[in-house]
C-alpha cells in the first residue's frame, strides 16, 4: 500500500518511519511511504507556502497553489483518496482504519498554522479525518498515526495476523490484561489460569477480563457489541450479561 504524505516539515516524519514495524513493512514491500515536501511546489524564491488571511485575523493560512500542484503531481502516479487531517473531519476509529486499509493508496495532507485555503479543500480533498477533539500544531503526528494504524492491518505486516484480530477495537472491547515474567512482582501474582496450559480456560478468562475492563473503563463501547451464544453463556455465569443488556437498552 502506498502512503503519500504532504507536509512542509518532512523531517518530522522521517525518524518514526525508520524504526520498528513500519521500517520492516517498508523493507518487505508491504507499504511504501512517499513524503512530499510542499515547499518544492512553491513558485517564489523563498518557497513560501503560507500567507496572511483575507479579512484579517491572527496567524497565517496555507496557500492553495503549492498544495494543488503537489496533489496534481501525485495524481500522475497514484494519489488514491486525498485526505485532509483536520479537527473538522469525521472521527478516526479502528473501523475507518480498516476502511482505508482496503485502498491501494491514500494521500494525507498535513495542515499547519491557522488552516488551509478553503478553495484547495473544495477542489482536491476527498475526505477529512480528525483524530479527536484536540488541537495539534500540525497534521504530521496525525498522519503518522494513520500510517501506523492502517499498516498494521495489512497482511504480513505484524508477522502474526492473529494479533490484528485480537486487538482492542477489532471488536468493541478493550484488550484483556497482559502478564509476563516474573510470575510474582512486588507481591502480585500472575492469575493461575494463565499458567494452567488449558487453552480454552485461558481464552474464556481473557474474554471475561476484556468485557469487565470495557464495562468499567469504556462502557459506551459495549452498546455496539454483539455476542455469540457461547459468549452469552459465559457472561451469564459471571453475572455480566444482564448488566450489558441494561446498558444496550439505555438508548
Swiss-Prot record:
HAMAP family, per the entry: TrmD
Protein name according to UniProt: tRNA (guanine-N(1)-)-methyltransferase
Residue positions binding S-adenosyl-L-methionine: 111, 131-136
Source species taxonomy: Bacteria, Pseudomonadati, Thermodesulfobacteriota, Desulfobulbia, Desulfobulbales
Protein source organism: Desulfotalea psychrophila (strain LSv54 / DSM 12343)
InterPro entries linked to this entry: Alpha/beta_knot_MTases (IPR029028), tRNA_m1G_MeTrfase_C_sf (IPR023148), tRNA_m1G_MeTrfase_TrmD (IPR002649), tRNA_m1G_MTases_N (IPR029026), tRNA_MeTrfase_TRMD/TRM10 (IPR016009)
GO molecular function: tRNA (guanine(37)-N1)-methyltransferase activity
Keyword DNA-binding included in the entry's annotation: no
Pfam families reported in the protein's UniProt record: tRNA_m1G_MT
Role summary: Specifically methylates guanosine-37 in various tRNAs.
Subcellular locations according to the entry: Cytoplasm
Amino acid at each position: 500500500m502506498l502512503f503519500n504524505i504532504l507536509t512542509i516539515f518532512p523531517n518530522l516524519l522521517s525518524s518514526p518511519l525508520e524504526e520498528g514495524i513500519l521500517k520492516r513493512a517498508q523493507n518487505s514491500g508491504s507499504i511504501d511511504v512517499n513524503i512530499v515536501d510542499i515547499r518544492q511546489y512553491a513558485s517564489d524564491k523563498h518557497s513560501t507556502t503560507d500567507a496572511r488571511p483575507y479579512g484579517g485575523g491572527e496567524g497565517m493560512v496555507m496557500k492553495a497553489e503549492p498544495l494543488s500542484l503537489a496533489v496534481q503531481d501525485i495524481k500522475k502516479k497514484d494519489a488514491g483518496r486525498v485526505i485532509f487531517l483536520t479537527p473538522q473531519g469525521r472521527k478516526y476509529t479502528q473501523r475507518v482504519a480498516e476502511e482505508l486499509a482496503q485502498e491501494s493508496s491514500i494521500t494525507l495532507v498535513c495542515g499547519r498554522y491557522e488552516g488551509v485555503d478553503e478553495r484547495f479543500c473544495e477542489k482536491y480533498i476527498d475526505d477529512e479525518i480528525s483524530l479527536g477533539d484536540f488541537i495539534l500544531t500540525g497534521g504530521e503526528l496525525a498522519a503518522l498515526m494513520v500510517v501506523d494504524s492502517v499498516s498494521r492491518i495489512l497482511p504480513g505486516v505484524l508477522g502474526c495476523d492473529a494479533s490484528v484480530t485480537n486487538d482492542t477495537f477489532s471488536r468493541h472491547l478493550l484488550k484483556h490484561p497482559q502478564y509476563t515474567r516474573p510470575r510474582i512482582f512486588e507481591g502480585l501474582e500472575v492469575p493461575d489460569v494463565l499458567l494452567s496450559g488449558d487453552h480454552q480456560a485461558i481464552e474464556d478468562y481473557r474474554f471475561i477480563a476484556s468485557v469487565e475492563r470495557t464495562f468499567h473503563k469504556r462502557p459506551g463501547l459495549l452498546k455496539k457489541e454483539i455476542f455469540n451464544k457461547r459468549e452469552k453463556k459465559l457472561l451469564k455465569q459471571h453475572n455480566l450479561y444482564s448488566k450489558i443488556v441494561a446498558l444496550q437498552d439505555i438508548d
